[in-house]
Swiss-Prot record:
This is Bacilliredoxin SRU_0242. NCBIfam families: YphP_YqiW. Gene3D superfamilies: Glutaredoxin. Residues 141-172 are annotated as: Disordered. Residues 154-172 have a biased composition (Polar residues). Belongs to the bacilliredoxin family. PANTHER family: BACILLIREDOXIN BRXA, UPF0403 PROTEIN YQIW-RELATED. Signal peptide: none annotated. It holds the Pfam family Disulph_isomer. It comes from Salinibacter ruber (strain DSM 13855 / M31).
Length: 172
């Protein structure tokens, strides 16, 4: 059962105030991806969880302020815009396990970079933003991306690499 609209509206606005378009139906998803077919598109799967509030949404804001920016930026809200979220996952993210929050950068209709929940949990917004900026710099240009362009964050230098998020480390 979805959370009350009044509860999630502020969470939606954290992204829409940045100029990110909400996709609330499969038709909205088709229209957005159709418009970005030969361009770049950043998809954010929003969520009510703490790592969305404390990590993902602030990281997106920081990354978009830093630039470069994608041609299009869109969001669906997991658990709220259920049909749109399921459709975007099934249609545009095949083989990628569902998670939220989640971010994917698309270039020419194909996902080229993903940030899954496991790349967000226990990390500071600045670190998540740096990962996203690296992807934007590699893929949001008129030039071909470098051969070593990343496809996911490299967590090997993260303090929590390979372990539990900091909030759960005391129980390991």
């Amino acid at each position: 059962m979805p959370y009350p609209k009044s509860m999630v509206e502020p969470m939606r606005k954290e992204l829409t105030r940045l100029g990110i378009d909400e996709l609330k139906s499969p038709d909205d998803v088709d229209a957005a991806f159709g418009a970005a077919e030969d361009e770049t598109l950043l998809l954010i799967i929003n969520s009510v969880c703490g790592c969305a509030a404390g990590g993902a949404r602030p990281a997106v804001a920081q990354a978009l302020e830093t630039g470069p920016t994608p041609d299009h930026a869109v969001t669906v809200f997991a658990g709220q815009d259920v049909a749109a979220t399921d459709y975007v996952r099934d249609t545009h993210l095949p083989g990628i396990p569902p998670s939220s929050p989640f971010m994917a950068l698309f270039r020419n209709g194909q996902p080229v970079y993903v940030i899954e929940r496991k790349h967000i949990e226990g990390r500071e917004p600045a670190a998540i933003s740096a990962d996203l900026v690296e992807a934007l710099q590699a893929y949001c240009t008129d030039e071909a991306p470098p051969s070593d362009a990343p496809s996911r964050p490299d967590l090997s230098s993260s303090p929590n690499a390979g372990g539990l998020p900091s909030t759960f480390q005391s129980i390991s």
